[in-house]
Amino acid sequence: MQTTQMEYHNPVLLMPTVDGLAIKPDGVYVDVTFGGGGHAREILKRLGPKGKLIAFDQDKDALENTIDDSRFVLVNENFRFLKRFLRFHGHKEVDGILGDFGVSSHQFDVAERGFSTRFEAELDMRMDQGSAFSAYDVVNNYDESQLASVLFQYGELRASKAMARVICEAREKEPIKTSEQLKETMGRFLPKHREHKILAQIYQAIRIEVNQELEVIKEFLQQALEVLKPDGRLSLISYHSLEDRLVKRFMRNGMFEGEPEKDMFGRVEVPMKPVGKFIIPDAAEIKENNRARSAKLRVAKKL
């Protein structure tokens, strides 16, 4: 098994995430967020000669991290197309699915991708670099109410309406093209002691909108339930409350909102069952990789 790897961080919660799949040597597994390939390589170590791993990543940079292994296939597509491409590769059912929903360190550390608040860069934030829609479009083309909604729903920012108004006023004078311009525009909302946190929330909101992250996760989860075999495992890492809420609810009752209907005897049939409690990184892992600090792993199996 040969690899060619770009600079990516060590995979978060590597062992517990792969352990959560309860891998069968001859099973078929999916890594829907290939990235640097860390989780994928650990899965391949545990598979036998007849096992199979299909990985997804829409970021063309991830293709540089190729794994030369006959048991491995890398699909350069968004995992919202999970079912379609599994069928294309001859698989209607799989034994387990792994996903790490975080933005990779590589994406954060390449300044021109525009994901990080640390760098001066054009407003971009596209995970799929082939997409025509970027952070520039959200910041400069959304009306005030749309902007306020994005900042409130996805950034959980209390001052979302005021922020949206200030952005709209600023862009009337000139387009907001760069991260530095956006930061200057938001200056009054960034007190020194909370500047980085609030700016990160603003970036998170815009990034989620650009990439339709929550809608993609919903589509993926519904398809995952369809393609998992009975007792098949779902092992997922989320990084903020919006993602985790979707994952938690879906693993508990197969729904994103509301409660499942009861039958005439008051019983509820649910399609999945959580396996154990959620897992977070220990102090040693957080010290080694600070971006792991907000990670939360949940595992479930299909009933």
Which residues make up each language-model segment?
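S-adenosyl-L-methionine-dependent methyltransferase catalytic core, i.e., the SAM/SAH-binding region
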Residues: M1-L303
